[in-house]
Protein backbone atom coordinates (compact mmCIF):
# COMPACT_ATOMS: atom_id res chain seq x y z
CA UNK A 1 0.00 0.00 0.00
CA UNK A 2 2.05 2.94 -1.25
CA UNK A 3 1.66 6.00 0.96
CA UNK A 4 1.77 9.71 0.24
CA UNK A 5 1.88 9.03 -3.50
CA UNK A 6 -0.11 12.18 -4.28
CA UNK A 7 2.13 15.15 -5.05
CA UNK A 8 1.79 18.90 -4.67
CA UNK A 9 0.13 21.08 -7.25
CA UNK A 10 1.95 24.08 -8.65
CA UNK A 11 0.27 26.32 -6.07
CA UNK A 12 1.61 24.15 -3.25
CA UNK A 13 -1.73 22.63 -2.39
CA UNK A 14 -2.05 18.90 -1.61
CA UNK A 15 -5.37 17.25 -2.36
CA UNK A 16 -6.58 14.93 0.39
CA UNK A 17 -9.04 12.41 -1.04
CA UNK A 18 -11.31 12.04 1.97
CA UNK A 19 -12.76 8.64 2.85
CA UNK A 20 -16.54 8.41 2.86
CA UNK A 21 -16.36 5.71 5.56
CA UNK A 22 -13.82 5.14 8.39
CA UNK A 23 -12.13 2.27 6.57
CA UNK A 24 -9.01 0.42 7.66
CA UNK A 25 -6.06 -1.11 5.82
CA UNK A 26 -2.90 -2.86 6.97
CA UNK A 27 0.67 -3.28 5.69
CA UNK A 28 2.58 -6.18 7.30
CA UNK A 29 6.32 -6.66 6.71
CA UNK A 30 7.93 -10.11 6.93
CA UNK A 31 11.51 -11.28 6.84
CA UNK A 32 12.56 -14.50 5.14
CA UNK A 33 14.60 -16.81 7.38
CA UNK A 34 16.42 -20.02 6.50
CA UNK A 35 14.57 -23.05 7.88
CA UNK A 36 17.81 -24.56 9.22
CA UNK A 37 20.19 -21.76 10.21
CA UNK A 38 17.43 -19.29 11.13
CA UNK A 39 19.50 -16.50 9.61
CA UNK A 40 18.00 -14.10 7.07
CA UNK A 41 17.63 -15.14 3.42
CA UNK A 42 17.96 -12.56 0.66
CA UNK A 43 15.50 -14.39 -1.60
CA UNK A 44 12.49 -12.05 -1.69
CA UNK A 45 12.86 -11.35 -5.41
CA UNK A 46 12.60 -15.03 -6.34
CA UNK A 47 9.65 -15.54 -3.98
CA UNK A 48 7.76 -12.60 -5.44
CA UNK A 49 8.59 -13.75 -8.98
CA UNK A 50 7.15 -17.20 -8.28
CA UNK A 51 4.00 -15.73 -6.74
CA UNK A 52 3.52 -13.59 -9.83
CA UNK A 53 1.70 -10.29 -10.18
CA UNK A 54 -0.19 -9.74 -6.94
CA UNK A 55 -1.18 -6.26 -5.75
CA UNK A 56 -1.23 -7.62 -2.19
CA UNK A 57 2.47 -8.66 -2.14
CA UNK A 58 5.29 -6.11 -2.42
CA UNK A 59 9.07 -5.91 -2.31
CA UNK A 60 10.78 -3.68 0.25
CA UNK A 61 14.12 -1.95 0.88
CA UNK A 62 16.00 -5.19 1.56
CA UNK A 63 15.95 -8.43 -0.41
CA UNK A 64 15.17 -10.39 2.74
CA UNK A 65 11.74 -8.75 3.10
CA UNK A 66 8.27 -9.15 1.62
CA UNK A 67 5.31 -6.97 2.50
CA UNK A 68 1.71 -8.15 2.49
CA UNK A 69 -1.10 -5.57 2.36
CA UNK A 70 -4.87 -5.59 2.58
CA UNK A 71 -7.45 -3.95 0.43
CA UNK A 72 -9.90 -1.44 1.87
CA UNK A 73 -11.60 -3.09 4.86
CA UNK A 74 -14.48 -2.19 7.16
CA UNK A 75 -12.88 -3.37 10.39
CA UNK A 76 -10.05 -5.33 11.98
CA UNK A 77 -11.71 -8.71 11.54
CA UNK A 78 -12.11 -8.21 7.80
CA UNK A 79 -8.50 -7.02 7.54
CA UNK A 80 -7.24 -10.17 9.28
CA UNK A 81 -9.18 -12.40 6.89
CA UNK A 82 -7.74 -10.45 3.97
CA UNK A 83 -4.17 -10.84 5.25
CA UNK A 84 -4.55 -14.54 6.04
CA UNK A 85 -5.90 -15.33 2.57
CA UNK A 86 -2.89 -13.61 0.99
CA UNK A 87 -0.34 -15.11 3.37
CA UNK A 88 -1.31 -18.77 2.95
CA UNK A 89 -0.01 -19.14 -0.63
CA UNK A 90 2.94 -16.84 0.12
CA UNK A 91 4.00 -19.04 3.03
CA UNK A 92 3.64 -22.14 0.87
CA UNK A 93 6.04 -20.72 -1.71
CA UNK A 94 8.46 -19.64 1.01
CA UNK A 95 8.45 -23.07 2.68
CA UNK A 96 8.99 -24.86 -0.63
CA UNK A 97 12.22 -22.87 -0.94
CA UNK A 98 13.51 -23.93 2.48
CA UNK A 99 12.55 -20.77 4.33
CA UNK A 100 9.98 -19.45 6.79
CA UNK A 101 8.15 -16.18 7.31
CA UNK A 102 9.39 -14.28 10.36
CA UNK A 103 8.10 -11.08 11.90
CA UNK A 104 9.48 -8.99 14.75
CA UNK A 105 10.85 -5.46 14.95
CA UNK A 106 14.38 -6.81 14.49
CA UNK A 107 16.05 -10.16 13.83
CA UNK A 108 17.83 -11.29 17.01
CA UNK A 109 21.25 -12.10 15.55
CA UNK A 110 21.47 -11.27 11.81
CA UNK A 111 24.42 -9.24 10.53
CA UNK A 112 23.11 -6.04 8.94
CA UNK A 113 26.28 -5.53 6.88
CA UNK A 114 25.70 -8.58 4.64
CA UNK A 115 22.08 -7.83 3.71
CA UNK A 116 21.36 -7.00 0.07
CA UNK A 117 19.48 -3.97 -1.21
CA UNK A 118 16.47 -4.32 -3.50
CA UNK A 119 17.29 -3.00 -6.97
CA UNK A 120 15.25 0.21 -7.24
CA UNK A 121 16.32 3.85 -7.78
CA UNK A 122 14.50 5.17 -4.69
CA UNK A 123 16.22 2.65 -2.42
CA UNK A 124 19.62 3.38 -3.93
CA UNK A 125 19.05 7.11 -3.40
CA UNK A 126 18.02 6.51 0.22
CA UNK A 127 21.25 4.64 0.96
CA UNK A 128 23.34 7.17 -0.97
CA UNK A 129 22.02 9.93 1.26
CA UNK A 130 21.76 8.20 4.64
CA UNK A 131 24.86 5.96 4.35
CA UNK A 132 25.70 4.00 7.55
CA UNK A 133 22.34 4.61 9.23
CA UNK A 134 20.41 3.74 6.11
CA UNK A 135 22.30 0.48 5.63
CA UNK A 136 21.43 -0.51 9.19
CA UNK A 137 17.66 -0.39 8.66
CA UNK A 138 17.32 -4.12 9.35
CA UNK A 139 13.87 -3.57 10.85
CA UNK A 140 10.28 -4.64 10.23
CA UNK A 141 6.99 -3.05 11.18
CA UNK A 142 3.26 -2.83 10.68
CA UNK A 143 1.44 0.17 9.23
CA UNK A 144 -2.27 0.78 9.81
CA UNK A 145 -4.31 3.12 7.60
CA UNK A 146 -7.61 4.58 8.83
CA UNK A 147 -9.91 6.57 6.57
CA UNK A 148 -10.65 10.19 7.48
CA UNK A 149 -13.35 12.25 5.80
CA UNK A 150 -11.65 15.62 5.37
CA UNK A 151 -8.21 17.22 5.22
CA UNK A 152 -9.02 19.72 7.97
CA UNK A 153 -9.33 16.85 10.48
CA UNK A 154 -6.03 15.15 9.67
CA UNK A 155 -3.47 17.22 11.57
CA UNK A 156 -5.56 17.68 14.76
CA UNK A 157 -6.13 13.91 14.86
CA UNK A 158 -2.45 13.10 14.29
CA UNK A 159 -1.39 15.54 17.01
CA UNK A 160 -3.98 14.26 19.49
CA UNK A 161 -3.11 10.63 18.73
CA UNK A 162 0.40 11.26 20.05
CA UNK A 163 -1.11 10.89 23.54
CA UNK A 164 -1.48 7.17 22.78
CA UNK A 165 1.90 6.78 21.09
CA UNK A 166 3.49 4.98 24.07
CA UNK A 167 0.51 2.66 24.44
CA UNK A 168 0.79 1.48 20.83
CA UNK A 169 4.57 1.11 20.91
CA UNK A 170 4.65 -0.72 24.25
CA UNK A 171 2.01 -3.22 23.12
CA UNK A 172 3.82 -4.02 19.87
CA UNK A 173 7.43 -3.86 21.12
CA UNK A 174 9.26 -6.84 19.64
CA UNK A 175 12.87 -5.82 19.08
CA UNK A 176 14.95 -6.37 22.21
CA UNK A 177 17.88 -7.92 20.33
CA UNK A 178 20.31 -6.46 17.82
CA UNK A 179 23.21 -8.31 16.20
CA UNK A 180 23.16 -11.02 18.86
CA UNK A 181 22.97 -8.73 21.89
CA UNK A 182 20.16 -7.79 24.24
CA UNK A 183 19.92 -4.01 23.86
CA UNK A 184 18.05 -3.47 27.12
CA UNK A 185 15.24 -1.91 25.07
CA UNK A 186 11.79 -3.34 24.42
CA UNK A 187 11.84 -1.67 20.99
CA UNK A 188 15.28 -1.08 19.56
CA UNK A 189 13.57 -0.64 16.18
CA UNK A 190 11.91 2.60 17.33
CA UNK A 191 15.30 4.03 18.26
CA UNK A 192 16.90 2.87 15.01
CA UNK A 193 14.29 4.10 12.57
CA UNK A 194 14.24 7.67 13.89
CA UNK A 195 17.87 8.08 12.80
CA UNK A 196 16.74 8.61 9.20
CA UNK A 197 16.50 12.37 8.53
CA UNK A 198 12.79 12.46 7.67
CA UNK A 199 11.65 9.78 10.14
CA UNK A 200 10.52 10.01 13.75
CA UNK A 201 7.75 11.96 15.44
CA UNK A 202 5.49 14.24 13.38
CA UNK A 203 5.42 17.96 13.97
CA UNK A 204 2.54 19.40 16.00
CA UNK A 205 0.52 20.89 13.15
CA UNK A 206 -3.14 21.86 13.55
CA UNK A 207 -3.98 23.01 10.02
CA UNK A 208 -3.65 21.19 6.69
CA UNK A 209 -2.09 24.32 5.22
CA UNK A 210 0.79 23.98 7.71
CA UNK A 211 1.50 20.52 6.35
CA UNK A 212 1.35 21.82 2.78
CA UNK A 213 3.88 24.55 3.62
CA UNK A 214 6.11 22.01 5.34
CA UNK A 215 6.14 19.74 2.28
CA UNK A 216 6.85 22.72 0.03
CA UNK A 217 9.78 23.76 2.21
CA UNK A 218 11.15 20.21 2.26
CA UNK A 219 11.09 20.06 -1.52
CA UNK A 220 12.48 23.54 -2.04
CA UNK A 221 15.49 22.80 0.16
CA UNK A 222 16.12 19.40 -1.44
CA UNK A 223 15.34 17.37 1.66
CA UNK A 224 12.75 15.31 -0.23
CA UNK A 225 11.76 14.84 -3.85
CA UNK A 226 8.47 13.08 -3.16
CA UNK A 227 6.11 13.03 -0.21
CA UNK A 228 6.63 9.30 0.36
CA UNK A 229 10.06 10.27 1.69
CA UNK A 230 8.37 11.74 4.78
CA UNK A 231 8.70 8.75 7.08
CA UNK A 232 6.98 10.00 10.23
CA UNK A 233 5.67 7.54 12.81
CA UNK A 234 2.18 8.89 12.05
CA UNK A 235 1.61 10.62 8.71
CA UNK A 236 -1.11 11.62 6.27
CA UNK A 237 -1.68 9.54 3.16
CA UNK A 238 -3.44 12.09 0.93
CA UNK A 239 -4.16 9.92 -2.12
CA UNK A 240 -5.76 7.22 0.05
CA UNK A 241 -7.66 9.60 2.30
CA UNK A 242 -6.13 8.01 5.41
CA UNK A 243 -3.97 8.60 8.43
CA UNK A 244 -1.16 6.05 8.45
CA UNK A 245 0.07 4.86 11.86
CA UNK A 246 3.61 3.48 11.55
CA UNK A 247 4.48 3.21 15.26
CA UNK A 248 4.33 -0.57 15.52
CA UNK A 249 7.20 -3.01 15.70
CA UNK A 250 6.72 -6.13 13.60
CA UNK A 251 3.94 -8.39 14.91
CA UNK A 252 4.35 -12.17 14.80
CA UNK A 253 0.71 -13.33 14.89
CA UNK A 254 -2.82 -12.48 13.81
CA UNK A 255 -4.23 -12.47 17.36
CA UNK A 256 -2.07 -9.57 18.51
CA UNK A 257 -2.25 -7.84 15.16
CA UNK A 258 -6.05 -7.86 15.22
CA UNK A 259 -5.98 -6.25 18.67
CA UNK A 260 -3.57 -3.50 17.59
CA UNK A 261 -5.50 -2.77 14.39
CA UNK A 262 -8.80 -2.58 16.29
CA UNK A 263 -7.27 -0.26 18.89
CA UNK A 264 -5.82 2.04 16.23
CA UNK A 265 -9.08 2.06 14.28
CA UNK A 266 -11.10 2.93 17.38
CA UNK A 267 -8.70 5.66 18.51
CA UNK A 268 -8.78 7.52 15.20
CA UNK A 269 -12.54 7.14 14.70
CA UNK A 270 -13.09 8.37 18.26
CA UNK A 271 -11.00 11.49 17.61
CA UNK A 272 -12.80 12.03 14.29
CA UNK A 273 -16.22 11.87 15.98
CA UNK A 274 -15.08 14.24 18.74
CA UNK A 275 -14.11 16.79 16.09
CA UNK A 276 -17.55 16.38 14.51
CA UNK A 277 -19.07 17.13 17.93
CA UNK A 278 -17.18 20.43 18.05
CA UNK A 279 -14.59 19.35 20.59
CA UNK A 280 -11.06 20.75 20.57
CA UNK A 281 -8.69 17.81 20.74
CA UNK A 282 -5.98 17.76 23.42
CA UNK A 283 -2.38 18.60 22.57
CA UNK A 284 0.54 17.00 24.41
CA UNK A 285 3.68 19.15 24.77
CA UNK A 286 6.23 17.81 22.26
CA UNK A 287 8.85 17.30 24.98
CA UNK A 288 6.44 14.93 26.75
CA UNK A 289 5.69 13.11 23.49
CA UNK A 290 9.41 12.60 22.87
CA UNK A 291 9.97 11.32 26.41
CA UNK A 292 6.99 8.96 26.18
CA UNK A 293 8.37 7.46 22.98
CA UNK A 294 11.69 6.81 24.67
CA UNK A 295 10.08 5.35 27.80
CA UNK A 296 7.92 2.96 25.78
CA UNK A 297 10.89 1.91 23.64
CA UNK A 298 13.07 1.36 26.70
CA UNK A 299 10.64 -0.16 29.20
CA UNK A 300 7.75 -1.44 27.07
CA UNK A 301 4.75 -2.43 29.18
CA UNK A 302 6.58 -1.38 32.36
CA UNK A 303 6.79 2.24 31.18
CA UNK A 304 5.49 5.01 33.43
CA UNK A 305 4.08 7.39 30.83
CA UNK A 306 3.26 11.11 30.97
CA UNK A 307 -0.47 11.60 30.53
CA UNK A 308 -0.99 15.30 29.87
CA UNK A 309 0.36 18.85 29.81
CA UNK A 310 0.19 18.91 33.62
CA UNK A 311 2.85 16.16 33.75
CA UNK A 312 0.68 13.58 35.48
CA UNK A 313 2.09 10.04 35.16
CA UNK A 314 0.77 6.49 35.20
CA UNK A 315 1.77 2.93 34.35
CA UNK A 316 0.93 2.40 30.68
CA UNK A 317 -1.05 -0.82 31.27
CA UNK A 318 -3.23 0.85 33.91
CA UNK A 319 -4.02 3.64 31.48
CA UNK A 320 -4.78 1.07 28.78
CA UNK A 321 -7.47 -0.50 30.96
CA UNK A 322 -9.34 2.81 31.19
CA UNK A 323 -8.75 3.61 27.53
CA UNK A 324 -10.22 0.29 26.39
CA UNK A 325 -13.30 0.85 28.52
CA UNK A 326 -13.80 4.30 27.00
CA UNK A 327 -13.49 2.95 23.45
CA UNK A 328 -16.13 0.22 23.84
CA UNK A 329 -18.95 2.24 22.18
CA UNK A 330 -16.69 2.97 19.20
CA UNK A 331 -15.73 -0.69 18.92
CA UNK A 332 -19.41 -1.65 18.82
CA UNK A 333 -20.04 0.78 15.96
CA UNK A 334 -17.04 -0.60 14.06
CA UNK A 335 -17.89 -4.26 14.81
CA UNK A 336 -14.49 -4.92 16.38
CA UNK A 337 -15.41 -5.56 20.02
CA UNK A 338 -13.90 -9.05 19.91
CA UNK A 339 -10.62 -7.85 18.42
CA UNK A 340 -10.35 -4.92 20.86
CA UNK A 341 -10.93 -7.30 23.78
CA UNK A 342 -7.68 -9.07 22.84
CA UNK A 343 -5.52 -6.06 23.77
CA UNK A 344 -5.21 -7.07 27.46
CA UNK A 345 -4.02 -10.52 26.36
CA UNK A 346 -0.78 -8.85 25.30
CA UNK A 347 0.07 -7.49 28.72
CA UNK A 348 -1.36 -10.45 30.61
CA UNK A 349 0.54 -13.06 28.57
CA UNK A 350 3.60 -10.95 27.83
CA UNK A 351 4.46 -8.77 24.85
CA UNK A 352 6.74 -10.12 22.14
CA UNK A 353 9.91 -8.60 23.61
CA UNK A 354 9.14 -10.33 26.92
CA UNK A 355 8.39 -13.67 25.28
CA UNK A 356 11.61 -13.49 23.27
CA UNK A 357 13.69 -12.94 26.39
CA UNK A 358 11.98 -15.84 28.14
CA UNK A 359 12.73 -18.18 25.23
CA UNK A 360 16.36 -17.06 25.13
CA UNK A 361 16.73 -17.69 28.85
CA UNK A 362 15.13 -21.14 28.56
CA UNK A 363 17.59 -22.07 25.78
CA UNK A 364 20.80 -20.82 27.40
CA UNK A 365 20.89 -17.73 25.22
CA UNK A 366 20.48 -19.54 21.88
CA UNK A 367 18.77 -16.90 19.75
CA UNK A 368 17.92 -19.41 17.04
CA UNK A 369 15.28 -20.67 19.46
CA UNK A 370 13.83 -17.15 19.55
CA UNK A 371 13.43 -17.23 15.77
CA UNK A 372 11.83 -20.69 16.02
CA UNK A 373 9.32 -19.40 18.56
CA UNK A 374 8.38 -16.33 16.53
CA UNK A 375 7.96 -18.35 13.32
CA UNK A 376 5.68 -20.80 15.13
CA UNK A 377 3.37 -17.99 16.27
CA UNK A 378 2.16 -17.31 12.72
CA UNK A 379 -0.98 -19.45 12.64
CA UNK A 380 -3.11 -18.86 9.53
From Swiss-Prot:
Pfam families, sorted: GCS2 (PF04107)
Enzyme superclass (EC): ligase
Xref: InterPro entries: GCL_type2/YbdK_subfam (IPR050141), GCS2 (IPR006336), Gln_synth/guanido_kin_cat_dom (IPR014746), YbdK (IPR011793)
E.C. numbers: 6.3.2.2
Coiled coil (UniProt feature): none
Record flagged with keyword Membrane: no
GO molecular function list: ATP binding; glutamate-cysteine ligase activity
GO biological-process terms attached to the record: modified amino acid biosynthetic process
Record's catalysed reaction(s): L-cysteine + L-glutamate + ATP = gamma-L-glutamyl-L-cysteine + ADP + phosphate + H(+)
Key word Nucleotide-binding present: yes
Keywords, sorted A to Z: ATP-binding, Ligase, Nucleotide-binding
Cited Gene3D superfamilies: 3.30.590.20
SUPFAM superfamilies for the chain: Glutamine synthetase/guanido kinase (SSF55931)
Similarity-based family: Belongs to the glutamate--cysteine ligase type 2 family. YbdK subfamily.
Reported function: ATP-dependent carboxylate-amine ligase which exhibits weak glutamate--cysteine ligase activity.
Protein name: Putative glutamate--cysteine ligase 2-1
Source organism of the structure: Mycolicibacterium vanbaalenii (strain DSM 7251 / JCM 13017 / BCRC 16820 / KCTC 9966 / NRRL B-24157 / PYR-1) (Mycobacterium vanbaalenii)
